Structure formats: structure tokens, C-alpha cells
Curated annotation (Swiss-Prot):
May play a role in DNA repair. It seems to be involved in an RecBC-independent recombinational process of DNA repair. It may act with RecF and RecO. A zinc finger (C4-type) spans 57-72. This is Recombination protein RecR. Residues 80-175 form the Toprim domain. GO terms for molecular function: DNA binding; zinc ion binding. Keywords: DNA damage, DNA recombination, DNA repair, Metal-binding, Zinc, Zinc-finger. InterPro entries: DNA_Rcmb_RecR, Rcmb_RecR, Rcmb_RecR_Znf, TOPRIM_dom, TOPRIM_RecR. The gene is recR. Gene3D superfamilies: 3.30.60.80, 3.40.1360.10, 6.10.250.240, RecR Domain 1. The keyword Amino-acid biosynthesis does not apply. It holds the Pfam family RecR_ZnF. Belongs to the RecR family.
Length: 198
């Protein structure tokens, strides 16, 4: 069906979001059009502010509104342990269990040979710099239990083992193919507590 240009453009914009198909995008567009002007203006303002005011921490790569992020600035955290995750949503999921008290490192992706993504295409160089400059004794790899997650964890283990850094992996309370951000808090807690050395 042909919609007026402004609605068609809004549908197109919504459909570019992950997990949003044309039907959902259409529903969202029409819902947005029916909202009060002040609500739409606040939504637009918040969207623009988030895009403008958020950046990645220069130390760990986590999404933040300050640099360095609050976690990297927190001197009470265990400076000898770094937990490596794929993206900032994983940091949030792990922070919600309130059991891990070390630092994080966000890769912004995984090594994926099938998709042409190698170690230089993700945030690994800053991790290696951090490890050389700080007294880190353990790195916990918390990538998803997928082929790319496994490839990434094995690469990290191969690179760090010669440096004498203990490299561990989250325990397998997480099902193969599952995403950390969707795991419940008890599963994540058990995975951290029962991590295994690589």
C-alpha cells in the first residue's frame, strides 16, 4: 500500500532497527503519528541527545556519557581482573547481578572468519595495551557460546597465555548459541563463579 511520504519515510526509518520488520515498523509509525506532540518532541530530543552525548570509553570501550566511564574510574573495583564481552549490553547484564567487581573490556564484535572479521577488526589492540600497562592477573572471556564467540575466546587465549596471564571462560550454564544479554541473573552468576581456565 502506498502511504503519504512522511509516513513512508517514518516506516522506513523504524524498519532499519534490528528486529523490526515492515509490519512492526508500520505499527510504530502510525502509533507515533497518533502521539501527543510534546511526547513526540521529547522522544526526538532524547534520541538526538543519546546519539550526541554517548561515546565509547577510551579505556574499556563501554558505552558512556563520560570518559573514562564510571567503571574504569571506580578505584574500589578489582584492577587485576578484566572481563571481556562482545558489546556494552553484556556489561549491563553482568553488572545487574552485582557479583563481579573487576573491570571490563568491550570488543565491539567477534572474530568471524566466515564474515571476513579478523582480530584487527575488533577492539583487541587497546586490551593488549591495558594488559601491558597494568598488573592484570586474570582475563575472563565472556563471549557468547557461538562459533564466533569460541573463535574469539580461543584467539584471546592463544595471545595471552605466553604473557603468563590466566585466561578463563564463563562456565557452560549458558546454552550454546545463547546471548549473554538475555541470560537470567542466576545463570550469569553461576557462569562467573564456575568459569574454567582456557
Amino acid at each position: 500500500m502506498l502511504y503519504p511520504t512522511p509516513i513512508a519515510k517514518l516506516i522506513d526509518s523504524y524498519s532499519k532497527l534490528p528486529g523490526i520488520g515492515i509490519k512492526t515498523a508500520t505499527r510504530l509509525a502510525f502509533y507515533t503519528i497518533g502521539m501527543e506532540d510534546d511526547v513526540v518532541n521529547e522522544f526526538a530530543k532524547n534520541l538526538l541527545a543519546a546519539k550526541r552525548d554517548l561515546s565509547y570509553c577510551s579505556i574499556c570501550g563501554n558505552l558512556t556519557d563520560q570518559d573514562p566511564c564510571a567503571i574504569c574510574q571506580d578505584s574500589t573495583r578489582d584492577q587485576s581482573t578484566i572481563l571481556i564481552v562482545e558489546d556494552s549490553r553484556d556489561v549491563t547484564a553482568l553488572e545487574n547481578i552485582q557479583e563481579y567487581h573487576g573491570l571490563y573490556h568491550v570488543l565491539h564484535g567477534l572474530i568471524s572468519p566466515m564474515n571476513g572479521i579478523g582480530p584487527d577488526d575488533i577492539n583487541l589492540k587497546t586490551l593488549l595495551t591495558r594488559l601491558m600497562e597494568n598488573e592484570v592477573t586474570e582475563v575472563i572471556v565472556a563471549t557468547n557460546a557461538t562459533a564466533d564467540g569460541e573463535a574469539t575466546s580461543m584467539y584471546i587465549s592463544r595471545v595471552l597465555k605466553p604473557a603468563g596471564i590466566k585466561v578463563t571462560r564463563l562456565a557452560r550454564g549458558l546454552a550454546v548459541g545463547s546471548d549473554i544479554e538475555y541470560a537470567d541473573e542466576v545463570t550469569l552468576l553461576r557462569a562467573i563463579e564456575n568459569r574454567t581456565e582456557l
